[in-house]
C-alpha cells in the first residue's frame, strides 16, 4: 500500500506568500536611507561634527544608535526623538544644549545609554527621564546644573552609572536616588556641595564607588553613609573637611579605600575608623594633622597602604605613637612622612628624628607622651613641664619641675645608623674584591692568546737578562787571572788545577799552560 502526499496550499496561496516575503525583504532597504552629512553603518548613524543646529529628521525608525556629538544643537524639544523608538544609545555631548523640554526623550523605552555631557544645561524637568526605564548609563557631567528635582531620577531602576561631575550643585535632595536600586557608580565631584543630607544616598544599596572630591564639604559624619551597604571606594579628597566624626555605632564592613587627601583635617574622632574593619587603603596626605592617638592607629588593623605626608607633624614626644606604629607597619606609605615642627627637626623623616633626637624612650611600646620641652633663654637649661604619658591604658604622671642644667644639647650619634654604615662599607669592599676577581677570570677566558704572548715576551726578556749576567760574570773572572803560574821543572804533560777546575797541560817554554 503506497502513501500519497497532497500539498494543502493552492497556487494562489503560494503566490501570496511569495509576494509577502519579497515585501518584507524590501522594507529594511527602504528604511536605510542615511541622513545627509551622516555616516551610517547598518543601523548605527554617526552625525558628529557636521554643524547641525537641531536633531535631523529620522529616516530610519529602526536605527539602534545615533551620535550627534560636536554640533551646535541648542535645545531638545518635546518628542524630539519619537521617531527613534528603537534607539539603544544616544550621544549628544559637546553641543550647546541649554534647554531640555519635558518628555524630550519620550518613546525611547529601549535606550540604555544617554550622553549629555559638555553642554550648557542648567535645569532639567522632573519628567525628563521618566520613560527611560531601561537606561543603564547617564552622563550629565560638565554642565551648569545648580539643583536637581527630587524626582528627577524616579523610575531609573536599571541605572548603573551616573555622572554629575563638574556642575554647580550645592545640595543633594533627600531621597534623590531612592529609585536607583541598581546604581553602582556615582560621580558628584567638582561641584559646590557644602554638606550632605542624612538620607541623601538612601536607596543606593548596590553602590560600590562614590566620588565627592573637589567640593566644599567642611564636615563629614560617616553616619550619613549608613545606607551604602555595598560601598567599596569613597573619594573625599580636596574639600575643606576639618573634622571627621561618626554619629552612630555601626560597622561599615565593605569599605576598602578612603581618600581624604588635600583637606584641612585637624582632629579625628577616636572611634571613626573602628566602623571600617576592612579598610585597606587610607590616604590623608596634605592635611593639618600634628599627631595621631594610638587608639586611632590601632583600629587600622587591615591597612596595607597609608598616606600621611604633607601634614603638620610635631616631632616631639607627642609623635611617639605614630612613630611606633610606622615602625611596625607591614604595608607601605606613598610618600615620606616629614617633621614640620619644631624648627630643628623640620624636614627630617619622623623615624629618623625620633632616633636621632631620642624623642621616645621605647618604640616597642606604644607611648603617647604629653610632656613638652622648651628652651629657657634666661637660665640656659631645659625644663620639662609637668604632664603625663600613657603606656597602654595606664596614665603615669611625670615629675613636675625637673630641671637639667646644660649648656648645649647635641644629639648623640645613633648606634643603629653607625652599624648600618659599617655594614654598607664592608659590603662595598667585598663587592669590589669579587668584581676584580670576576674581571680577571673573564679576561683569562676571553683573551688567552694575548696572555700567552705576554708570558712568552716575559720569558724571552728574562732569558736575555740571564745571558747578559753570565757574560758579565765570565768577563770578571778572566780579569782576575784564572790560570796559575808555574815553574817547569820536568818535561812532559802534567796536571794543573786552576779556577776552572782540573786540566791536563803540556809543558811549554813559557809559563803558561795550554789545554
Swiss-Prot record:
The LRRCT domain, residue ranges: 311-362
Domain LRRNT: 34-61
Residues linked to a glycan: 57, 126, 243, 362
Residues in LRR repeats: 63-83, 86-107, 110-131, 134-155, 158-179, 182-203, 206-227, 230-251, 254-275, 278-299
Cell compartments where the protein resides: Cell membrane; Postsynaptic cell membrane
TM annotation in the entry: 422-442
Residue span of motif Involved in DLG4-binding: 512-515
GO molecular function: neurexin family protein binding
Gene3D superfamilies in UniProt: Ribonuclease Inhibitor (3.80.10.10)
Annotated SUPFAM superfamilies: L domain-like
Record topological domains on the Extracellular side: 34-421
A biological-process GO annotation: regulation of postsynaptic density assembly
SMART domains (alphabetical): LRR_TYP
Domain of life, source organism: Eukaryota
CC annotations in GO: excitatory synapse; GABA-ergic synapse; glutamatergic synapse; hippocampal mossy fiber to CA3 synapse; membrane; postsynaptic density membrane; Schaffer collateral - CA1 synapse
Protein keywords: Cell membrane, Glycoprotein, Leucine-rich repeat, Membrane, Postsynaptic cell membrane, Repeat, Signal, Synapse, Transmembrane, Transmembrane helix
Distribution of this protein across tissues and organs: Expressed in neuronal tissues.
Predominant localisation class: membrane
InterPro entries per UniProt: Leu-rich_rpt, Leu-rich_rpt_typical-subtyp, LRR_dom_sf
Topology relative to the membrane: Single-pass type I membrane protein
Cytoplasmic side: 443-515
Record family assignment: Belongs to the LRRTM family.
Quaternary organization: Interacts with DLG4. Interacts with neurexin NRXN1; interaction is mediated by heparan sulfate glycan modification on neurexin.
Protein task: Involved in the development and maintenance of excitatory synapses in the vertebrate nervous system. Regulates surface expression of AMPA receptors and instructs the development of functional glutamate release sites. Acts as a ligand for the presynaptic receptors NRXN1-A and NRXN1-B.
Domain-level remarks: Synaptogenic effects are mediated by the extracellular LRR region.
Name of protein: Leucine-rich repeat transmembrane neuronal protein 2
Amino acid at each position: 500500500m503506497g502513501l500519497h502526499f497532497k500539498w494543502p496550499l493552492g497556487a494562489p496561496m503560494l503566490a501570496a506568500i511569495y509576494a509577502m516575503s519579497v515585501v518584507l525583504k524590501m522594507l529594511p532597504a527602504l528604511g536605510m536611507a542615511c541622513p545627509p552629512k551622516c555616516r551610517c553603518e547598518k543601523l548605527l548613524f554617526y552625525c558628529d561634527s557636521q554643524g547641525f543646529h537641531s536633531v535631523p529628521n529620522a529616516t530610519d525608525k529602526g536605527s539602534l544608535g545615533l551620535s550627534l556629538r560636536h554640533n551646535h544643537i541648542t535645545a531638545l524639544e518635546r518628542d524630539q526623538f519619537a521617531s527613534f523608538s528603537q534607539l539603544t544609545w544616544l550621544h549628544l555631548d559637546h553641543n550647546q544644549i541649554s534647554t531640555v523640554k519635558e518628555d524630550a526623550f519620550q518613546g525611547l523605552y529601549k535606550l540604555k545609554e544617554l550622553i549629555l555631557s559638555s553642554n550648557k544645561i542648567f535645569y532639567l524637568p522632573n519628567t525628563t527621564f521618566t520613560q527611560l526605564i531601561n537606561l543603564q548609563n547617564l552622563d550629565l557631567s560638565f554642565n551648569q546644573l545648580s539643583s536637581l528635582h527630587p524626582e528627577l531620577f524616579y523610575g531609573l531602576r536599571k541605572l548603573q552609572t551616573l555622572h554629575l561631575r563638574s556642575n554647580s550643585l550645592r545640595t543633594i535632595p533627600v531621597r534623590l536616588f531612592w529609585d536607583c536600586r541598581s546604581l553602582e557608580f556615582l560621580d558628584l565631584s567638582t561641584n559646590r556641595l557644602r554638606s550632605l543630607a542624612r538620607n541623601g544616598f538612601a536607596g543606593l544599596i548596590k553602590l560600590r564607588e562614590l566620588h565627592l572630591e573637589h567640593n566644599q564639604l567642611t564636615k563629614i559624619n560617616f553616619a550619613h553613609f549608613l545606607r551604602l551597604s555595598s560601598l567599596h571606594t569613597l573619594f573625599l579628597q580636596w574639600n575643606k573637611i576639618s573634622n571627621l566624626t561618626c554619629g552612630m555605632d555601626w560597622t561599615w564592613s565593605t569599605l576598602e579605600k578612603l581618600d581624604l587627601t588635600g583637606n584641612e583635617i585637624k582632629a579625628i574622632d577616636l572611634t571613626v575608623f573602628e566602623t571600617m574593619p576592612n579598610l585597606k587603603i587610607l590616604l590623608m596626605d596634605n592635611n593639618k594633622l600634628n599627631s595621631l592617638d594610638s587608639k586611632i592607629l590601632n583600629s587600622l588593623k587591615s591597612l596595607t597602604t597609608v598616606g600621611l605626608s604633607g601634614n603638620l607633624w610635631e616631632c616631639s614626644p607627642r609623635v611617639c605613637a605614630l612613630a611606633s606604629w610606622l615602625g611596625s607597619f607591614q604595608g607601605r606609605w606613598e610618600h615620606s612622612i616629614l617633621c614640620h615642627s619644631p624648627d630643628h627637626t623640620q624636614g627630617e623623616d619622623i623615624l629618623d628624628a625620633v632616633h636621632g633626637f631620642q624623642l621616645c624612650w621605647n618604640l616597642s611600646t606604644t607611648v603617647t607622651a604629653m610632656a613638652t620641652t622648651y628652651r629657657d633663654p634666661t637660665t640656659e637649661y631645659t625644663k620639662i613641664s609637668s604632664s603625663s604619658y600613657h603606656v597602654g591604658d595606664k596614665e603615669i604622671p611625670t615629675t613636675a619641675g625637673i630641671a637639667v642644667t646644660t649648656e648645649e644639647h647635641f644629639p648623640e650619634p645613633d648606634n643603629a645608623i653607625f652599624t648600618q654604615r659599617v655594614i654598607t662599607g664592608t659590603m662595598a669592599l667585598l663587592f669590589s674584591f669579587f668584581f676584580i676577581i670576576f674581571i680577571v677570570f673573564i679576561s683569562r677566558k676571553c683573551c688567552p692568546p694575548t696572555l700567552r704572548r705576554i708570558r712568552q715576551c716575559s720569558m724571552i726578556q728574562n732569558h736575555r737578562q740571564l745571558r747578559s749576567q753570565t757574560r758579565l760574570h765570565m768577563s770578571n773572572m778572566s780579569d782576575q787571572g784564572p790560570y796559575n803560574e808555574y815553574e817547569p821543572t820536568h818535561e812532559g804533560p802534567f796536571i794543573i788545577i786552576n779556577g776552572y777546575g782540573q786540566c791536563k797541560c803540556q809543558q811549554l817554554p813559557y809559563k803558561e799552560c795550554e789545554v
